[in-house]
């Protein structure tokens, strides 16, 4: 890894001792000459924002397929919400906000079209060829698949960003050659740990909003969940007579704030309990330091169970899952059987990467809209090719 110099003066002076710092980064894989003195993690964030994979997140779904309505969250809006929540937590813990933001914006770059259904389909189809997992695909995107710079593929991000992407929401000892050199079996920076929870806070609460908007779940159902009911009643007491729509937004906002405050308090207690004062201490302790309190963890688990049963397994969501499986399976099988259907630059990679992996990369990079259009072009007789 190549180190960068001259960044210390532009980085916040009040960062905690256990925060990651650009000036102490393990560097980048490829040497580069920079024309400005941005700190390394700020540069990483900027590269992520400007890459093609980030723009495609606008048309990749969370729960609702993109064409079902302009209101619903996409992977792009979700990533922005994760960044906002993550930075709010990082600021209060005196952590590196630029690293936190870079990780938030990159954490879903490897996601497939059609949400987690797409990931499940590709993992099944890639059995025997290395499988598919979206965190590792995010790594492939920033390490290999983006083609923007002379002399190397990928975005040439800092070591700490790559480590955080690989270890996002997952066991830290993944048995894969991808993380050799990224401390397998060791927890990542606290900034990376924050993103695991910012991700969860964002998608749980915003799936509630989208679920209510769609009519797939109701306030009456949610009031059976202790955590939601407590906040809903608090808003009702504070704002008597408030209309239902405003009350919903205020409840979601207050719930996000409640979860953030609990997370910060529990994390501060963990840092004190384990005597963590440096980043080396974070590695030495080698257990997650960012957590909810045990009480909040259980209450939040009940909310997640509710969403799984009532929203993610709603019959209309299930119908879209079945359709998505069909689209992606038929596309994959057709491309593997007839690789000349792929753009030439993908065909040229097959001798090196293997036909199945190239097809997998191509499909994983699709938006919902492109996948639907491609399915029509290949399988509907009156559709223009």
UniProtKB/Swiss-Prot annotation:
It comes from Geobacter sulfurreducens (strain ATCC 51573 / DSM 12127 / PCA). This is Deoxyguanosinetriphosphate triphosphohydrolase-like protein. PROSITE patterns: HD (PS51831). The keyword RNA-binding does not apply. InterPro entries: dGTPase (IPR006261), dGTPase-like (IPR050135), dNTPase_2 (IPR023023), HD/PDEase_dom (IPR003607), HD_domain (IPR006674), PHydrolase_assoc_dom (IPR026875). Gene3D superfamilies: Hypothetical protein af1432. Keywords: Hydrolase. It holds the Pfam family HD. It comes from the Bacteria. The lineage of its organism: Bacteria, Pseudomonadati, Thermodesulfobacteriota, Desulfuromonadia, Geobacterales. Belongs to the dGTPase family. Type 2 subfamily.
């Amino acid at each position: 890894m190549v180190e960068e110099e001259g960044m210390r003066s532009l980085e916040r002076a009040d960062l905690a001792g256990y925060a990651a710092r650009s000036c102490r980064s393990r560097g980048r894989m490829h040497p580069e000459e920079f024309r400005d003195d941005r700190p390394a993690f700020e540069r990483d964030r900027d590269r992520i924002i400007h890459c093609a994979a980030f723009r495609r997140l606008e048309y990749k779904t969370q729960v609702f397929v993109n064409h079902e309505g302009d209101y619903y969250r996409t992977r792009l809006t979700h990533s922005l919400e994760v960044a906002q929540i993550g930075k709010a937590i990082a600021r209060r813990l005196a952590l590196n906000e630029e690293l936190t933001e870079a990780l938030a914006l990159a954490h879903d770059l490897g996601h497939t079209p059609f949400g987690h259904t797409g990931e499940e389909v590709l993992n099944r189809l890639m059995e025997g060829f290395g499988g598919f997992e979206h965190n590792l695909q995010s790594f492939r995107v920033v390490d290999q698949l983006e083609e923007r710079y002379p002399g190397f593929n990928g975005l040439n991000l800092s070591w700490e960003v790559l480590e955080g992407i690989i270890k996002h929401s997952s066991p830290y000892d993944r048995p894969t050659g991808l993380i050799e050199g990224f401390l397998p079996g060791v927890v990542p920076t606290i900034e990376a740990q924050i993103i695991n929870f910012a991700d969860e806070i964002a998608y749980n609460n915003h799936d509630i909003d989208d679920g209510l908007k769609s009519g797939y779940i109701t306030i009456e159902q949610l009031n059976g969940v202790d955590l939601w009911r407590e906040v809903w009643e608090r808003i009702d007491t504070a704002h008597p007579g408030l209309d239902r729509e405003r009350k919903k937004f205020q409840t979601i906002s207050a719930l996000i704030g409640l979860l953030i405050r609990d997370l910060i308090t529990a994390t501060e207690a963990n840092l004190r309990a384990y005597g963590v004062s440096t980043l080396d201490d974070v590695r030495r302790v080698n257990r997650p330091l960012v957590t909810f309190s045990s009480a909040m963890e259980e209450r939040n688990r009940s909310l997640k169970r509710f969403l799984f049963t009532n929203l993610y397994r709603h019959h209309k969501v299930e119908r879209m899952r079945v359709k998505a499986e069909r689209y992606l399976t038929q596309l994959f099988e057709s491309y593997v059987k007839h690789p000349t259907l792929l753009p030439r630059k993908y065909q040229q990679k097959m001798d090196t990467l293997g036909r199945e992996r190239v097809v997998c990369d191509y499909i994983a990079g699709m938006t919902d809209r492109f996948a639907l259009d491609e399915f029509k072009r290949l399988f509907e007789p009156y559709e223009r090719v």
